[in-house]
Amino acid sequence: MARVLAMLFISMVVSGYYFPFSFAVFPQLNTKMALAMTGVFLVVLQGCRRHKISFSKELLGAIIFAFVFSFICFIAADYNHTDDYSYVTYFISFFTWLGGAFVVCFAIRMLHGKATLSLLTGYLTFVCVSQCILAILIDRFPAFQLLVDTYVSQGQEFFQEVRRLYGIGAALDPAGVRFSIVLLLIAYLLCENEDVKQAKWKVSVYLFAFFVIAVIGNMISRTTSVGLLLGIAYLICSTGIFRLIIRRSYFRLYSILGGMLITFIILGVYLYEHDPFFYRNIRFAFEAFFNWVETGELRTDSTDKLNTVMWIWPENLKGWLIGTGLFANFVYSTV
C-alpha cells in the first residue's frame, strides 16, 4: 500500500512538471518553477556530498545549444533595434525545465532504484490518461469544474470562452505536443521493450492508454494527431506489417490491438449517435476526417487559419537571414 501511495505521489510530481499549473492562492508560481527550485537545491546538495557537479556530454551539448539560441535571438533583437527579448532569456526557461526534470528522475530513482526510459514512459502514460479523464470530468460535471477552477489558476477563462477541453495544466497546443511525445514513447515500448512485449497485461494497458490519449487527447488539442500518426507509422515500420507478414514476436501485440480497435470503434459509434458531449468533441478532434467524408475536403478551421494569418514569411533578405527581432505580443496576428 505504501508503495502504491509513493507511486501516486511520483505521478503527481510528474504531472506538475509535464503539465505545469499554478494554484489560485499564489498564481505567480507554477508547479514547474517550484520543482525547478527544488532541483537546484538537490543538485547543490548532491554536489556537496560528491564534491563535484558533473554533466553528461549530451546534456552539455543541449546547454550550449540553449545559450547559442538565446544569443542568436539577442543579436536579432539588437540588430533590428527592438526591445522584444522574449526568447533572449530562453536559457532561463531551459534550466527551469532541466531543474524540474532532475526532481522527476530523482523521485523515480528513490523509489525504483533507477530512472529508465521505460519507467518514465509508464509514469507519463498514467499522467496523460489521468489528464484525459480529468478533462472529461471537468467538461461534463459543472460541480467538478467549479472545484478545479476554484483552486487551480491556468487561464481557464479563455479555454471556456473558446469551448475547449482542459485538464489540470493540460490544454491547447502545449498539451497536444506532450501527448504526441507520449504516444511515440508508447509505440517505442510496444515495439522495442522485451519486458513489455512478453507481458500480455502490459501490452493491453499501453494499447488502451494509446487509444485513450489518441481520442481524448485530440479532443483537448488536435496537435495530438501528429503523435498519433507518427506512433502508427513507428508501429508499422518497426513490426514490418507493411510486408503483410506478422512476425511471431508481434502476434500478441496485433491480436490485442485488433480487439481493442474493434471495441473502440463500436463504442465510438454508439457514443457518437447517443451522447451530445461526445458528438461535439469527437467532431472537433477529427474535424479533418469528418470534412473529408462529408465534403471531400481534407481541411480544418485551424489549417485555414494557419494558411491565412499564422504562416507569416519574411518579406526581405534581412528577414530571412537575421529575423525581425519581434516575437511576443502577437505582432504577426497569430491569434
Placement of each model-derived feature along the sequence:
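Interfacial juxtamembrane loops and adjacent helix segments
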Residues: A143-R164, A328-V335
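Membrane-interface loop/short-helix elements at transmembrane-helix boundaries
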Residues: E161-R164, F278-Y332
